[in-house]
A protein has these predicted regions:
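A recurrent flexible, glycine/aromatic-enriched loop bordering the glycosyltransferase active site
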Residues: 66, 140-165
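Cell-envelope/extracellular polymer assembly enzymes that use nucleotide-activated donors
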Residues: 3-5, 33, 186
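Glycine-rich, basic loop-to-helix element that forms the pyrophosphate-binding segment
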Residues: 59-76
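Conserved donor NDP-sugar-binding/catalytic core segment of glycosyltransferases
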Residues: 92-131
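Short aromatic/hydrophobic "clamp" motif used to bind/position activated sugar donors
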Residues: 81
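A short, conserved alpha-helix in the catalytic core of glycosyltransferases
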Residues: 153-171, 176-198
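A conserved acidic beta->alpha catalytic loop
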Residues: 30, 38-46
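Short, acidic, metal-binding catalytic loop of nucleotide-sugar glycosyltransferases
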Residues: 22-31
């Protein structure tokens, strides 16, 4: 059985976080490890994590995305690290697609990412609801089932997954990029330097 450690940094965004975690639990084929880093958490996130028995790290103040992810990564116990935003919702069977791709590869020097759709006016625009309360999972699942995307090379969208071994080799996210701007392309550059071509 394959299992991922899903790292989610969060900063007082509880309603979205709950929806993201619901999507992991309801739309995954496999049972994954969910690890939060809670920045501040004064909106009830800390109590929610305790009640749900989630694995988490915590900082009283917002330490920035890169530091938050790196702290959460200290709790990883699986072979794969997946980075997810706290306001994302995963398609049904999302993990099966990643598992199938990973099994094709000859080694663990890879970086795989998903396709990110947003309600804003970008190339990948789609609106299944503008808030957690208005989100329509049935509409979203229909979209995921019918939308066909080409595989992209060179994308650095979250969610993305690497092996834990590779994460450790490159040292996770570079904390000089806190609060987080530029951290994704920097992470990809560190992977490139370490011979990652997929």
């Amino acid at each position: 059985m394959i299992q991922f450690s899903i790292l989610i940094p969060t900063f007082n965004n509880l309603d979205y976080l709950k929806l993201a975690i619901k999507s992991i639990k309801e739309n995954s084929i496999y049972n994954h490890e969910i690890i939060l880093h809670i920045n501040d958490g004064s909106d009830g996130t800390l109590e929610y994590a305790k009640k749900e028995k989630l694995i988490y790290t915590y900082s009283k103040d917002n330490i920035g995305l890169c530091s938050a992810i790196n702290k959460a990564a200290t709790k990883v116990s699986t072979k794969y690290v997946l980075y997810l935003h706290d306001d994302m919702y995963l398609c049904k069977n999302w993990d099966e697609f990643l598992k199938n791709e990973i099994e094709i590869l000859d080694d663990d020097l890879f970086y795989l990412s998903g396709t990110n759709y947003e309600i804003r006016d970008i190339d990948n625009k789609y609106n299944p609801g503008v808030s957690p309360e208005k989100f329509n999972p049935h509409l979203f699942h229909e979209f995921c089932t019918n939308k066909k995307e080409k595989d992209l090379q060179g994308s650095h969208w979250a969610p993305h997954i690497v092996s834990k071994r590779l994460w450790d080799i490159v040292g996770g996210f570079s904390e000089e990029f806190n609060p987080g701007d530029g951290s994704d392309p920097d992470f990809c550059m560190k992977l490139w330097i370490n011979n990652v071509r997929i």
